[in-house]
Amino acid sequence: MPTISELVAEHADENPDGLAFASEREKMTWADYERRSDALAGHLVAEGYGPGDRIAAQLPDGPDVHVAFVACEKAGLVAVGIGPRAGTQEVDHLMSRTGARTLLTDIAGLWGEPPPHERRLGPEDVFLLNSTSGTTGLPKVVVHDQARWFAFHELAVDAGELTNDDVCMSLVSAPFGFGIWTAHVTPAALGAPCVVLSRFDAATAVELIERHRVTVLAAVSTQFLMLLESPAFRPEALASLRVMFTGGEAVPERRAAEFEDRTGALVLQFYGSNETGALSRTTTKDDRPHRLRTAGRVIESMDVRLFGDGQPGCKGPLLSRGYLDDPAANAELFTDDGWMLTGDIVEIDGDGYLTVIGRASDFIIRGGKNVSAAQVEHEVGTHPAVALVAAVAAPDELFGERVCAYVVLRPGHDDLTLGELSDHLAERGVSKETWPEHLVVVDDLPRASGGKVAKGELRADIERRLAP
């Protein structure tokens, strides 16, 4: 099994002028990728960093972050990927937790002679430490080797019928799991170009999709919804798309169908996490109801078992190595007999299709009744005025918790009242227990460094709003 650095070297030799990365400001060929990663690796070795030392990188989501990761691999170092939106508290925490000796925030001018080949990491070596998305509290550190991501890549190639003729675009931050395979691993494995944005902007994404004739898009649910809502969205601009991989958050069926109808691309997803890799996937061969209403069939190479109230545990080649030096967190992540838990509640039907009911921790307990935040979000998201929605628990003296929905409105809609939303849900025949009892209209939803909605901030906000 080749490593990323070996693949980059191969493409630089066979296709030196071929495009490896493009962003809104620059292009990088495979020869550039090889040369720049060689030079940075040489600089790090010359600075005295030894095999296994940890180097943190907090760089914009452009080509440089991939140069840094490959340079660390060539120098025999472990990269610590820190999201570009991480604040100083999170950066300090991750530096301390990993023992990283240096933080790279700009790699311009860091050049040296390429290190000897024998220093390079192998596919089974730890090459990356990244973090959980940190939607609540400080993030944990996840340990990765390349072998798991190449196994993931093979599944992605099969699911989306990917080839080296494709042009990829990843809108997901590279240090996180979704971004690792869509921007760092799969383009290198295919020898295909990848378009990345230093910071997500829907209009810029549309423009670059059209300019580079992107065929494979990777975006979390919120991002593809923002593409749909952007004034810059034009079906002809996205006509080159074949498939879009999404996930990381619940995928709203109605809006996913709208994306397919307006672009002609098939919406696909993997279900899993940074820690587990993937448990299930949809493919181009699945029919539309299964693609958009489920998280796909359980992956054959993964052993999946449901515990208790439907929480899946898994074993198999896609797993990470768990959390770094964190026995307490690993005790929660793994069962005593070695099953890695996802923290979700799911159902698996007789044909092997998996449906996510919600996070085990993402339920609102109203008067002793568990209400799935994901179900609330799905139903609220069907209102024609709603672009984005997040449901959280609001504290309540009588019931303990009540359902609170934060919504971002679609262009052309100036307001939405709780009464109007309730009328809509009543017309749909939605069970009253899932109706929001608090509604907050906001301009945007807060994001954790990994791009997911920071529900901890929303819970704190509604507590402040309701405080006497």
Regions found by a protein language model. Give the residues of each.
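Conserved pre-ATP/AMP-binding loop-to-beta segment of ANL
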Residues: 16-17, 114-131, 138, 161-167
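Conserved AMP-binding/adenylation subdomain of ANL enzymes
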Residues: 150-167, 175-216, 230
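Gly/Ser/Thr-rich phosphate-binding loop
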Residues: 189, 214-219, 228-289, 303
